[in-house]
């Protein structure tokens, strides 16, 4: 015979235990942390998409092009972002490739390998950022360039850094005769000439 009272108590206990696990995982983070991390992840998605779209539009033969001696070539611009992403992720506690500074950005000019490395670096940063607590975000760290700042500030600084190199990539693309895909789409949607 079905015992409704026993069933209801079991169901109630299961729900309480489940809620305890969910609430416990968020108890270490404030609502502000969840908002910051969510916003940060959204910004990472945006910049990753722009960088990968621009890289995809660039021809392979322009990957080794550099505007002047001693200036990063096209592939190095994207790989520099990837290397910086790994630096950021390491400060977040992620397991990242152990390399000398500057090694990743000079590792290849193969467009497919550049794209793969860039994607992997964003994945590592997103996974690490998604698990941060208030305490971790507010922790003072020493950056690779010798400055002390909170992890939160370092994350924002490296987001700015990504945008800086997106701008550099846009210039390289334009000089190479490549229209950034999102600009071309906006211009064609508004009956512009795509330039």
Language-model region placement:
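Acidic/histidine-rich alpha-helical segments that form the ligand environment
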Residues: 107-142, 150-164
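N-terminal secretory signal peptides that target proteins for export/translocation
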Residues: 1-5
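Bacterial N-terminal signal peptides
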Residues: 10-22
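Short, contiguous alpha-helical
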Residues: 41-45, 52, 62-103, 142-195
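Juxtamembrane cytosolic interface motif at the C-terminal end of transmembrane helices
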Residues: 23-27
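Short N-terminal segments immediately surrounding and downstream of signal-peptide cleavage
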Residues: 28-49
């Amino acid at each position: 015979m079905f015992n409704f009272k026993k069933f209801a108590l079991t169901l109630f206990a299961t729900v309480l235990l489940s809620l305890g696990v969910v609430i416990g995982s968020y108890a270490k983070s404030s609502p502000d942390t969840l908002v910051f991390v969510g916003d940060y992840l959204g910004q990472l998605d945006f910049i990753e998409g722009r960088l990968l779209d621009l890289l995809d539009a660039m021809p392979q033969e322009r990957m080794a092009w550099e505007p002047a001696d001693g200036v990063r070539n096209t592939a190095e611009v994207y790989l520099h972002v990837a290397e910086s992403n790994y630096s950021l992720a390491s400060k977040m506690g992620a397991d990242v490739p152990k390399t000398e500074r500057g090694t990743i950005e000079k590792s290849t000019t193969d467009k497919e390998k550049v794209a793969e490395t860039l994607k992997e670096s964003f994945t590592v940063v997103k996974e690490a950022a998604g698990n941060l607590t208030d305490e971790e975000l507010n922790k003072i760290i020493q950056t690779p360039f010798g400055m002390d700042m909170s992890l939160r500030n370092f994350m924002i600084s490296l987001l700015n850094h990504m945008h800086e190199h997106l701008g550099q990539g846009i210039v390289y693309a334009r000089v190479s005769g490549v229209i950034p895909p999102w600009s071309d789409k906006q211009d064609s949607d508004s009956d512009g000439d795509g330039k």
